[in-house]
Amino acid sequence: MTKFTTEEVRSKFITYFKANNHTHVPASSLIPHNDPSLMFVNSGMVQFKNVFTGQEKRPYNKAVTSQKSLRAGGKHNDLENVGYTARHHTFFEMLGNFSFGDYFKEQAIYYAWNLLTKEFELPKDKLYVTVYHTDEEAASYWKKIAGFRDDRIIRIKTNDNFWSMGDTGPCGPCSEIFYDHGEQIYGGLPGTKDEDGDRFIEIWNMVFMQYEQIDKDTRIELPQKSIDTGMGLERMTAVLQHVNNNYDIDLFQEIINFTENIVKVKIEGEAKFSYRVIADHLRASSFLIADGVIPSNEGRGYVLRRIMRRAMRHAHMLGSKEPLMYKLLPKLVDLMGNVYPELKRAESFISSILEQEEIRFKTTLERGLKLLTEETETLTKGNELSGEIAFKLYDTYGFPLDLTEDILKNRDISVDHKRFEEQMLAQKERARKSWLGSGESKTDQLWFDIKEQHGSTEFLGYTLNEAECKIIALIKDNNLVNDIKEIDTQFLLISNQTPFYGESGGQMGDIGMIFSKDSEIEVIDTLKYLGSIIVHKCILKKGQIKIGENANFSIDIKYRQNLRIHHSATHILHAVLHEVLGKHVTQKGSLVAPTYLRFDISHSKAVTNEEITLIEDKVNEIIRDNHEVDTTLMTTEDAVKQGAMALFGEKYDSEVRVVKMGETSLELCGGTHVRRTGDIGCFKITSESAIAAGVRRIEAVCGEFVIKLMREKDSLLKSIESSLKTNKNELITKVNNILERNKELEKELEKVHLARLDLSIEQIEKQAEDIKGVKLIYRYIENLDNKVLRQAAENLTKKVEDLIVVYITGNNDKLSITVAVSKAITDKYKAGIIAKELSLFLGGSGGGGQASLAQAGGNDIGKLTNIQEKLHGLLTVS
């Protein structure tokens, strides 16, 4: 049997099926594109789910993939076993071939058997198969194609060999292929009491989708039968490399050996498990970050944080005191970056996120471990750690519950889950009460009461700029009132419906006017509470307003239009950032104002000037193309079917708004937008900056505000031209000449200062103060460059063998200290020590330097009056 590398196994599988007319489909993101029911892609068929159900058509009916997959949440949570068993992983690759109404059982079995025995050269006597106990058709094909007798075809009655997509939908029997590692390894055949051993390992699973489950009692034949298969790359490689543990294959060993070279701990004993955990979790963390997941305390981000912190704890066990994971990333990119180019594209970003998270957790890890050690000192095997302590570790020290359990695993100590969950619920309740009790607490509670009594506010603003609405609540000074009578009173107004957009999704709220038969009201802002109550922030301008009255609500159309153009530009910008900076870019926050937009993204380094220019060009090209902006209300289900992104963890109403801009962007969005991209006019980035680790902020303007910006810049340019008496064609030359002349003048001034500070030996003898046989020159000089002072002081100490020079200069409440000592006396007087002591005396943090020359700082100018006394004391003691 030939020995294959991991890369060769993957390549041969794909090449084999491509040669058999299968289309090679690239791996999808770990984040399911259209499936809020899944946290992560956990199998090869996920990206084809809609194809299997008939909701989507592809230009091919046979496919082959190598799909990156992750199981570390929900029912597929293998985290606690990873590193300790031979085959559990968080991240793994699933090889698969698929048929959508083309071939079925016989051909699928033939393809599998031929690949395994001819291409991979597996011994036939090492292979066994299972079939569903009623699937005689599959059994007969195994006999025909593989020549198996009944004793090598194992019939399984359980649902392990019958797959379904859910309570209803496509389903069918499975056939699994097992490899026998040999009798020297414990384990029994599938279906026996010893089946959980490691001797017989499943290497391939084939699902024959031939039925549709109508309800729990009704199952019918599908008119179009399909094939879904999965082969774990790591398992198959282990077989082909003659090892029984996935962590012993070449890919993992490369990472493990690379790690050993850094931490310098032998791969043996308990350390072996830590190396395996780190290798697995490095892959999972890196691929998740590459696909846009950032460590956080909720959703996918929290799963990533759990994985990373488990790896960090094992790095700590290996004695690694500094961040480790990011140092291993280059090896992973080298091993897998060619197959998954997203790793290469996002390498610097992944590296920065790994390092930042490790630094963050290092600060609490040791303290948390100390607490855990103290709390478990009296616990023995079979005991239980209290839920309160587990929660404290989670809440105070950032220990995910499964990390605490992992630490206690070897001691056979469990955690009181029930009490832990009670503590979690209590915290959520405290948070809710705290929220209700913070700020305008009385008003906060009112939103719950209003929603319970009146329900949600109906938003009319997608189609109407003004509408007749009924006043249902008025709030003044945090209290519900029946009417508002005092002119210029500020209050909150809620109506049954409104064309005013309440601030949400980053878009600021509308402004405008409300008119009733007796009043005129200015709306200065519109807010949204509890996700669905639209609240108008108002000022009474004329008359009075009462609950129950009808009024005409009219938005400021110009203000709304400016919001529209900046919101639509944000969508285009997001799409272009993906193209220019990479697929790792995810939205971390946004603000859509009438005069500008702000967009925060995950990106670990500054966006270059060249990238900014390219982004602007691409956004403006899409604007000029004048694509239609289709804003459609539909059900969430229909939106997802059309390909709109459904974000995991987001709660959507039964009706959502899908915003489509040509072929550029398709997003679920509740905001307001232009009708065509050309309505935006133009786009200009005004600033780019860092706001947090791994997060950049882009600000931009659109339409008339670009023109305004250009006019301001043009006006500034003309003012500069006028001041410098030049024109724009010669401006750069003029400025460069001025800068060059300024440098020359600075050098000349430096010479003047040096000459002014220079003293002859006779002048030194005359001006210096004698202290215990050494000469001291001290001077305080306003606003002089440190470089000049350093040079001047050093020049003097070279002229006289027993001289100490101390210069202090002040600028904006900051003091700079320069100390120079003649080299002949540096055995007794150290410039660094003198500078440090003076710095501390003047409120600085100390300083230092060479024995003959040192500089330091201070900020207490008031103590300068006593500085000579301090100097005398220092030199007398010396």
From Swiss-Prot:
Gene3D superfamilies: 2.40.30.130, 3.10.310.40, 3.30.54.20, 6.10.250.550, Bira Bifunctional Protein, Domain 2 (3.30.930.10), Threonyl-trna Synthetase, Chain A, domain 2 (3.30.980.10)
InterPro entries for the chain: aa-tRNA-synth_II/BPL/LPL, Ala-tRNA-lgiase_IIc, Ala-tRNA-ligase_IIc_anticod-bd, Ala-tRNA-synth_IIc_core, Ala-tRNA-synth_IIc_N, Ala-tRNA_ligase, Ala_tRNA_ligase_euk/bac, DHHA1_dom
Superkingdom, natural source: Bacteria
Catalytic activity: tRNA(Ala) + L-alanine + ATP = L-alanyl-tRNA(Ala) + AMP + diphosphate
Cofactor note: Binds 1 zinc ion per subunit.
Swiss-Prot/TrEMBL GO biological process terms: alanyl-tRNA aminoacylation; negative regulation of DNA-templated transcription
A GO cellular-component term linked to this record: cytosol
Binding site for Zn(2+): 567, 571, 669, 673
Transmembrane spans: none
Protein name in UniProt: Alanine--tRNA ligase
Organism: Rickettsia felis (strain ATCC VR-1525 / URRWXCal2)
GN (gene name): alaS
